[in-house]
Amino acid sequence: MALRFPRFSQGLAQDPTTRRIWFGIATAHDFESHDDITEERLYQNIFASHFGQLAIIFLWTSGNLFHVAWQGNFETWVQDPLHVRPIAHAIWDPHFGQPAVEAFTRGGALGPVNIAYSGVYQWWYTIGLRTNEDLYTGALFLLFLSAISLIGGWLHLQPKWKPRVSWFKNAESRLNHHLSGLFGVSSLAWTGHLVHVAIPASRGEYVRWNNFLNVLPHPQGLGPLFTGQWNLYAQNPDSSSHLFGTSQGSGTAILTLLGGFHPQTQSLWLTDIAHHHLAIAILFLIAGHMYRTNFGIGHSIKDLLEAHIPPGGRLGRGHKGLYDTINNSIHFQLGLALASLGVITSLVAQHMYSLPAYAFIAQDFTTQAALYTHHQYIAGFIMTGAFAHGAIFFIRDYNPEQNEDNVLARMLDHKEAIISHLSWASLFLGFHTLGLYVHNDVMLAFGTPEKQILIEPIFAQWIQSAHGKTSYGFDVLLSSTNGPAFNAGRSIWLPGWLNAINENSNSLFLTIGPGDFLVHHAIALGLHTTTLILVKGALDARGSKLMPDKKDFGYSFPCDGPGRGGTCDISAWDAFYLAVFWMLNTIGWVTFYWHWKHITLWQGNVSQFNESSTYLMGWLRDYLWLNSSQLINGYNPFGMNSLSVWAWMFLFGHLVWATGFMFLISWRGYWQELIETLAWAHERTPLANLIRWKDKPVALSIVQARLVGLAHFSVGYIFTYAAFLIASTSGKFG
């Protein structure tokens, strides 16, 4: 008999129904559950797949460079970044009539094109690329790296080159290499690129392979480094009248601590960025030599964990047993990695707009909005994934004997307290925030807006003042003009910071009021509720009050009727599933808040946000409805415009989102009935009945239907908001 899909599970391959296909797809990447899997093969498969992942990433970035070089207008954009619209790629569509061709021919192009809202133009410009040839060179290099990665993945699956399990479990060596190699050396290399290529380019000097060995990045070369006069590298920075990309007003400094923004580009000083990366490189190069390997120097992580006795014995046996628990569980390690990466991705979203690193990106409002929203959604999915794998760790890898009375076991012992406190915080935030919003709504509806409950966020304003924002009138720390911190700040460190924080043209420490106070607490409600669901799902993964014996049921068992006491919605997967809705909900509020506040800031009418954001009707009417007018107007009696594609996507996003409910609000019997009816009709229809299938069609399982529903809900939700965000922002600001 020929091998049927899935080859990794012979039991599933013999299933006579369509379940074979769906379960096969669902478990294709769950290597642990495959036939004949060994620990060694498991680690080797995952290791090899990392090379494939890298190959895809390099291929994708290569494609970005290639398409912009081929179909974009990079060289024209470089001449005038503020007024030329950057082109992502051409559009070839045989359906386009003349009005469509005219609507999408922009940015000086000869035919229809897409505008780039990804910020790649600003990024490439900042790091010193100037010509299409530079872009092609980068694309070819990344294509080469992609090929090398694929070869590496293939190579490490060959018997001679397969690493052993002991190699994968050598935590100290891996940590040393990742800290000093991945972070240290790459940061040092990036500092080198900034100093040798990007900073000269920002001063009008074109450094390439043919001349980089004879162009000194600093007039005194390496002299100051070897004589210990490092401060010379910070002297004579670019002046405030510097024109980026030219020598006009430029200096010679390469490593500075200026603070604030370049007045023309509104982005961080390149010399500050280089300094930052050099500092990071040194820190991580040192950190990468801290752990004991073959050389007998440095710390053993296991010794560190075992030696730590918590004060007063309040944490039981502390960290004993944790080293082996973590080192033998790839789910625990993945959970930690995803949690860290999720937080970092959200921080990227926050810092890309408040401290823009790329020249002129702060003046490209649509790109700013798109990048913020993109990174927040990515962060949400990564963070929920961290808890999913935390739950799988408890089910598959957690050994109570190994972890007796240590911090992990004690988390499980008092999980009721953790869950109930989170529940209490969520309820408090939800009822109070909604109560304030609804009260204010009613006051507006009754024509007495002066009776709203408006709370000034005085603690947050005090924190902003401590960082140097003077408009609130708090006389504290950096906003206290006669304090030592203020005086030191003028000269020693970051002299440009105080100018930047008090300038109202950027997004640093935006002025906040009662509307911000309310939406902040709405977001806090979303964060706490999402966390509650995720934490409960992970801590109850092995067993809960209703069902103490979940271990053998696995991660995603379905509803199993009243026979076993009713198992509906109590698998770890069900918690993850519910949490994703709350995560999307929360990020919706976050992005609504960010976008509305910035639209009013960019348009110069901040009072609209301040006055309308204190009640729900204000959000619905003055943010959502008012800004969707561009989308509703994509097609009208006068033909079409360049927003019509977003208008279509807005509708299509709603359709995908609504389709999700078809899967979410249904039951298995209905699906089976529907499929039987369709199969019956197919078999009795001439011509159609020539096509037969061997697998008997069966309904999706409850878990599968929920997954399909969740996928449609998520994709539709994000599609809809993406279209709204890009159309409403680009429609206003071009």
Curated annotation (Swiss-Prot):
Binding site for phylloquinone: W671
Bilayer topology term: Multi-pass membrane protein
Residues that bind chlorophyll a B3: M662, Y670
Binding site for chlorophyll a B1: H654
GO MF, one example: magnesium ion binding
EC numbers for this chain: 1.97.1.12
Major subcellular site: plastid
Transmembrane segments: 46-69, 135-158, 175-199, 273-291, 330-353, 369-395, 417-439, 517-535, 575-596, 643-665, 707-727
Entry's localization field: Plastid, Chloroplast thylakoid membrane
Cofactor, free-text remark: P700 is a chlorophyll a/chlorophyll a' dimer, A0 is one or more chlorophyll a, A1 is one or both phylloquinones and FX is a shared 4Fe-4S iron-sulfur center.
GO cellular component, one term: chloroplast thylakoid membrane
The entry's keywords: 4Fe-4S, Chlorophyll, Chloroplast, Chromophore, Electron transport, Iron, Iron-sulfur, Magnesium, Membrane, Metal-binding, Oxidoreductase, Photosynthesis, Photosystem I, Plastid, Thylakoid, Transmembrane, Transmembrane helix, Transport
Function: PsaA and PsaB bind P700, the primary electron donor of photosystem I (PSI), as well as the electron acceptors A0, A1 and FX. PSI is a plastocyanin-ferredoxin oxidoreductase, converting photonic excitation into a charge separation, which transfers an electron from the donor P700 chlorophyll pair to the spectroscopically characterized acceptors A0, A1, FX, FA and FB in turn. Oxidized P700 is reduced on the lumenal side of the thylakoid membrane by plastocyanin.
Family as reported in the entry's similarity comment: Belongs to the PsaA/PsaB family.
Subunit relationships: The PsaA/B heterodimer binds the P700 chlorophyll special pair and subsequent electron acceptors. PSI consists of a core antenna complex that captures photons, and an electron transfer chain that converts photonic excitation into a charge separation. The eukaryotic PSI reaction center is composed of at least 11 subunits.
Protein name as annotated: Photosystem I P700 chlorophyll a apoprotein A2
Designated gene of the protein: psaB
